[in-house]
Amino acid sequence: MSNNPRSQVITQGTQRSPNRAMLRAVGFGDDDFTKPIVGIANGYSTITPCNMGINDLALRAEAGLRTAGAMPQLFGTITISDGISMGTEGMKYSLVSREVIADSIETVCNGQRMDGVLAIGGCDKNMPGAMIAMARLNIPSIFVYGGTIKPGHYAGEDLTVVSAFEAVGQYSAGKIDEETLYGIERNACPGAGSCGGMFTANTMSSAFEAMGMSLPYSSTMAAVDGEKADSTEESAKVLVEAIKKQILPSQILTRKAFENAIAVIMAVGGSTNAVLHLLAIANTIGVPLSLDDFETIRHKVPVLCDLKPSGKYVTTNLHAAGGIPQVMKILLVNGILHGDALTITGQTIAEVLADIPDQPPAGQDVIHSWDDPVYQEGHLAVLKGNLATEGSVAKISGVKKPVITGPAKVFESEEDCLEAILAGKIQAGDVVVVRYEGPKGGPGMREMLAPTSAIIGAGLGDSVGLITDGRFSGGTYGLVVGHVAPEAYVGGAIALVQEGDQITIDAGKRLLQLNISEEELAQRRAQWTPPQPRYPRGILAKYAKLVSSSSLGAVTDIDLF
């Protein structure tokens, strides 16, 4: 087989002389038309620190591809800054951007008949967007993470961007003064890189390394360190070899790979968003995966890493302690991982991990041993009940009170909820309900970091529950339940909750229950009327029309016909 099985349709034969003429203008010579054409999907942007260092990595990828005998073609894709848009209408576009990224990469790579793709991303939706595209394309592909930010420092404390969100709640509750708030703001984000705890970006990069779609150690490197650029160039060379061997995403993204990724996410204490994104990727590649699979694996895998948001350390500390390979080796020797799963290098997981020690290094407490975990079971629990018949997702690590029954405080939007919290209207024992924030209802399934951080900052994190058909940031922790499905917009039971209703959240029993009779619930459902769409035109209108339930990954290309 040739090394350019797809691009030869635009580079070979007399009929393609005009095509070659245009390629010559962008740097192709006579000897280049038989080389594989590899796209570099470049997520560079100066709107967020997550992506502002990516262009330098794209240039290193370009150099690596040329050295390995390929012809690189660099193109841009978008990003939304979750952290900057958080708490605003702009956050509705965050999950939408995952689909735009996937669509854009698929469009360029198929339109230009590229033989492979190397995608570089930083902010949260860059990773799943790129992976969905790779799954659709099914051409040799590799993902390069832009890298994590280093921690900020203030008053002797390590900071992340979540520190700034929580400081708002602390300030509103009178726990810190304005000078401290300003000091945290100025020091939380010291430079380039994605948010530094085991938040969504670092969770997804870790998952992709565990699945074999990124190189070992690459998911926890700091954006500003030289090893990140070196790893990017090496990724390019590995991709060219994968093109020669025709190692495809469909061979890597198997059921075993998804189970490996879920296990690693549990072990590192990763974000609830990983559930949504892995469901979407699996749906795209055709691998059966459901919420129940996360619950099954959760009971087998302890939390091994003491990482923020609920823990002590940040991702650069994890990297120094051995990174994802060390975590994976512990899981492998304890029978959790599928060692025969293939990676983009052509090696199996077991072969990649062969030289990694079975135990974490001494003198550190970032990565714990199997026998001395941070928590005995995984932290991402799937809750069901009459409020979530399709399921919901809760992050239960660090929760001191895993059960709450209390009166509902109902809000139709995130903004109304945050205003009430900051005004002191939420009391210990309340269960906050934020609805019509789901994939269709928002639309866009916003993350609720602002209200959850305000609850934490106000000192109510152990005594107030929050449920929503929206999402949570990877920086969220506490007794919070998201991804409630069916969502309010389609008539899910969360739409039927009334102010003062008693709601039970029981993480141990994995129960989310509205404590009214079935007869009362049926009467309310009969009286419910669907709301009018919030957006009649534009991308949010299109998204609301197409998007599936969060229990299916909130994808936009199923059941279209």
Curated annotation (Swiss-Prot):
Record organism: Synechocystis sp. (strain ATCC 27184 / PCC 6803 / Kazusa)
Disulfide bridge map: none
Residues that coordinate or bind Mg(2+): D82, D124, K125, E447
Cofactor requirement: [2Fe-2S] cluster; Mg(2+)
Subunit structure: Homodimer.
Cofactor binding summary note: Binds 1 [2Fe-2S] cluster per subunit. This cluster acts as a Lewis acid cofactor.
Biological or metabolic pathway of the protein: Amino-acid biosynthesis; L-isoleucine biosynthesis; L-isoleucine from 2-oxobutanoate: step 3/4; Amino-acid biosynthesis; L-valine biosynthesis; L-valine from pyruvate: step 3/4
EC identifiers of the protein: 4.2.1.9
Function: Functions in the biosynthesis of branched-chain amino acids. Catalyzes the dehydration of (2R,3R)-2,3-dihydroxy-3-methylpentanoate (2,3-dihydroxy-3-methylvalerate) into 2-oxo-3-methylpentanoate (2-oxo-3-methylvalerate) and of (2R)-2,3-dihydroxy-3-methylbutanoate (2,3-dihydroxyisovalerate) into 2-oxo-3-methylbutanoate (2-oxoisovalerate), the penultimate precursor to L-isoleucine and L-valine, respectively.
Keyword Magnesium applies: yes
Catalytic activity: (2R)-2,3-dihydroxy-3-methylbutanoate = 3-methyl-2-oxobutanoate + H2O; (2R,3R)-2,3-dihydroxy-3-methylpentanoate = (S)-3-methyl-2-oxopentanoate + H2O
InterPro entries: DHAD_IlvD/Edd (IPR050165), Dihydro-acid_dehy_C (IPR042096), DihydroxyA_deHydtase (IPR004404), DiOHA_6PGluconate_deHydtase_CS (IPR020558), ILV_EDD_C (IPR056740), ILV_EDD_N (IPR000581), IlvD/EDD_N (IPR037237)
NCBIfam families (alphabetical): ilvD, PRK00911.1
Active site: S473
Any single GO BP term: branched-chain amino acid biosynthetic process
Keyword presence, ATP-binding: no
Family label: Belongs to the IlvD/Edd family.
Binding-site residues for [2Fe-2S] cluster, renumbered to this chain: C50, C123, C195
Protein name per the record: Dihydroxy-acid dehydratase
